[in-house]
């Protein structure tokens, strides 16, 4: 296929292309004008595709050296030259073998005649340093693609830390029949989810097998870690862990908390190492209930205290709804109620109600004008009491 840009006119502003003419062939790949001058790379972004002339010379020398070496090997084997189209390497626009088709392929170039063999052997010595330099330059500029393996996922830490010796029973691991320790319980795939306090969540233990013997037995240190939370580390038992089954741990109590139930106390007593008839689900449920107690309902609001009694008059009597009228018995000296009397004993204790003085019209009080000579309403009377 002909090069569509083979006879294009070069830009005239470049000093390296001052002598270019419309008839001069220009490569559409690297901008070199017939092997003369310096490459301008005007059609490439600056700084992206700008190899040096030395790199091109090294690549061309390596191509020639490898092509000659394969031709000599083919000729020495007596196979003759192959002119098949599929056995030839790809040719770039300058008629040279492509570098990517040469290493490791079966493509061959036509053998040269005996007359040119002496000249090629003489050039082998000159091209050997350039070929070595070209190989190093190609490996540096075009490194092979390596598959970056993902970093291995770190194994999770053991869910249960080993208990100190002598504190929570024996901490030795169970041994299988072949003498190897049983690592089934330490495998992260067989461990239930852990909440923030380290206890197993009961939802993950519904399908667990009943604790028995062999590899299914949890050691004492793990059982103790499941049943005892961080804030309930100290427990006291009345029977010291003696007995078996449901008879154990009935006297378990926590400092500062309410007495534990029979289920939680039984699971807590399992850290002594002899209780084997409790399932992990029951033990985890009791531990979860201890470490995460249910939210209690809000207490009933305390009723507000009764308001203070209203102050009536200058003496501050208790009953604010009375004391608006004078006590007739007190006037006669026969009232024995004292301060608890619902009427006022004098105008000093009388509670003033301005609404009671509306409607008198300024007329004199009829009770004062009568024979008894006093008014039971006192200061609250709507009539006039002699200038008051």
Swiss-Prot record:
One of its GO terms (molecular function) is zinc ion binding. Residues 61-109, 181-193 have a biased composition (Basic and acidic residues). The keyword Zinc applies. Residues 260-274 have a biased composition (Low complexity). Keywords: DNA-binding, Metal-binding, Repeat, Zinc, Zinc-finger. A zinc finger (C3H1-type) spans 321-348, 359-388. Residues 1-130, 144-282 are annotated as: Disordered. InterPro entries: Znf_CCCH, Znf_CCCH_sf. This is Zinc finger CCCH domain-containing protein 47.
């Amino acid at each position: 296929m002909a090069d569509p840009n083979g006879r294009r006119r070069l830009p005239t502003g470049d000093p390296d292309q001052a002598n270019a003419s419309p008839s001069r062939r220009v490569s559409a790949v690297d901008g070199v004008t017939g092997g003369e001058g310096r490459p301008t790379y005007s059609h490439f972004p600056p700084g992206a595709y700008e190899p040096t002339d030395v790199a091109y010379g090294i690549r061309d020398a390596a191509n020639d050296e490898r092509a000659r070496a394969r031709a000599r090997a083919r000729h020495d084997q007596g196979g003759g030259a192959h002119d098949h189209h599929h056995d030839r390497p790809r040719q770039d626009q300058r008629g040279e073998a492509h570098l990517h088709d040469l290493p490791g392929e079966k493509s061959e170039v036509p053998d040269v005649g005996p007359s040119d063999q002496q000249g090629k052997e003489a050039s082998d010595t000159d091209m050997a340093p350039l070929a070595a330099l070209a190989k190093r330059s190609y490996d540096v500029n075009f490194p092979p693609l390596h598959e970056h393996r993902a970093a291995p996922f770190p194994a999770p830490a053991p869910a249960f830390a080993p208990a100190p010796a002598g504190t929570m029973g024996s901490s030795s691991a169970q041994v299988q029949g072949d003498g190897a320790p049983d690592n089934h319980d330490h495998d992260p795939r067989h461990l239930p989810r852990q909440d923030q306090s380290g206890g197993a969540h009961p939802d993950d233990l519904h399908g667990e097998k009943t604790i028995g013997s062999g590899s299914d037995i949890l050691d004492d240190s793990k059982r103790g870690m499941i049943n005892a939370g961080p804030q309930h580390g100290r427990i006291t038992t009345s029977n010291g862990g003696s007995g078996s089954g449901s008879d154990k741990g009935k006297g378990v109590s926590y400092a500062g908390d309410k007495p534990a139930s029979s289920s939680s106390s039984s699971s807590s007593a399992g850290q002594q190492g002899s209780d084997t008839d409790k399932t992990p689900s029951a033990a985890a449920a009791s531990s979860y209930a201890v470490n995460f107690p249910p939210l209690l309902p809000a207490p009933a609001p305390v009723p507000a205290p009764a308001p203070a009694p209203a102050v009536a008059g200058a003496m501050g009597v208790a009953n604010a709804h009375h004391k608006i009228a004078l006590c007739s018995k007190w006037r006669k000296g026969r009232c024995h109620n004292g301060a608890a009397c619902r009427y006022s004993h004098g105008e000093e204790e009388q509670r003033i109600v301005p609404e009671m003085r509306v409607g008198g019209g300024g007329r004199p009080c009829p009770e004062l004008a009568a024979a008894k000579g006093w008014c039971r309403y006192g200061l609250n009377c709507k009539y006039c009491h002699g200038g008051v």
